[in-house]
Amino acid sequence: MIQMSTMTATSARSAGMTKDERFVILASSLGTVFEWYDFYLYGSLASIIGAQFFSAYPPATRDIFALLAFAAGFLVRPFGAIVFGRVGDIVGRKYTFLVTILIMGLSTFIVGLLPNAATIGIAAPSILIALRLLQGLALGGEYGGAATYVAEHSPQGKRGYYTSFIQTTATLGLFLSLIVILFTRTATGEQAFAEWGWRIPFLVSVLLLGISVWIRLRLNESPVFQRMKDEGKSSKAPLTEAFANWANAKIVLLALIGGTMGQGVVWYTGQFYALFFLQSILKVDGYTANLLIAWSL
């Protein structure tokens, strides 16, 4: 009997993905790739954005402000995870997905339309930073939400494998942003790209937003959440349950300080500061710098 149970469990784990499981992983991953694309465009174009929105300052100060604006989106991501994690626990994963992707896509599109500092003065960088904050909040909710959604569709013994696809989306989103930037630079030429062509990758995000919304609307609610809701077992105070318990809070702090924080420093230094350093310090032309980072991925 025990041997038969073991064989059954092994057979279930070795079975391939179902069509529905593949669609859940593809839809969740693709939408998250597009969100990373939106988030990383700023970092990939930080030197040009600094010249457009902080033009009143010397080059060194301009570069610092451009990096600080990029950091603003990064710093609010944990708050996005808290806010949208709570929303997801109350109203469901699917609708939270739609909210986060709409916030991210529209914020990115507006950056492409935003007048620079020479046109509207201090309002330009102020609005830019506000949009970066919205992007950070949206991404904070999206990334964890996507992993949770996929995990709740995963059969026993395959949760780590299924959610691992979500972990590839950050690199794919950065790569996609660099490819679009390289194509636009080639099509417009460097001078036109620095003047107005840099806006095109931001405006293109509205097309990706449309695709993402269409895909997300085809998804069903998470079966785990739906079952908890039907049985009246959904959490009424998810934040309190997660953080008021020291045993849970200790794990969160350990993961944040011991793992995620260090990983974030290494990743952003290796990709974005390297790109920024190539262009601003070593004076490598933008096309070559983008190409080098894209090849390194």
Question: Which ranges hold each PLM region?
Answer:
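Extracellular/periplasmic helix-loop-helix junction of adjacent transmembrane segments
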Residues: 46-79, 97, 122, 126
